[in-house]
Amino acid sequence: MEAALLLAKLPEAYQIFDPLVDVLPVIPVFFLLLAFVWQAAVGFR
């Protein structure tokens, strides 16, 4: 019974992380840009 009560409260607990979840899909794009900038810095060796 306690586990079901805990699961019911989880969405409320995750509301704090909503902005973080909105940002998460963008992170791979930043890695792609970082790789491009790094290659530009070393002169595309």
From Swiss-Prot:
Transmembrane segments: 24-44
Membrane topology category: Single-pass membrane protein
Recorded superkingdom: Bacteria
Any GO BP: photosynthesis
Location of this chain's protein in the cell: Cellular thylakoid membrane
Keywords, sorted A to Z: Membrane, Photosynthesis, Photosystem II, Reaction center, Thylakoid, Transmembrane, Transmembrane helix
Pfam families: PsbK (PF02533)
InterPro entries, per the entry: PSII_PsbK (IPR003687), PSII_PsbK_sf (IPR037270)
Residue positions assigned to the propeptide: 1-8
Predominant cellular place of this UniProt entry's protein: membrane
GO terms under cellular component: photosystem II reaction center; plasma membrane-derived thylakoid membrane
Family matches, as SUPFAM superfamilies: Photosystem II reaction center protein K, PsbK
Family per similarity comment: Belongs to the PsbK family.
Protein function: One of the components of the core complex of photosystem II (PSII). PSII is a light-driven water:plastoquinone oxidoreductase that uses light energy to abstract electrons from H(2)O, generating O(2) and a proton gradient subsequently used for ATP formation. It consists of a core antenna complex that captures photons, and an electron transfer chain that converts photonic excitation into a charge separation.
Oligomer status and interactors: PSII is composed of 1 copy each of membrane proteins PsbA, PsbB, PsbC, PsbD, PsbE, PsbF, PsbH, PsbI, PsbJ, PsbK, PsbL, PsbM, PsbT, PsbX, PsbY, PsbZ, Psb30/Ycf12, peripheral proteins PsbO, CyanoQ (PsbQ), PsbU, PsbV and a large number of cofactors. It forms dimeric complexes.
Protein's UniProt name: Photosystem II reaction center protein K
Native species: Synechococcus elongatus (strain ATCC 33912 / PCC 7942 / FACHB-805)
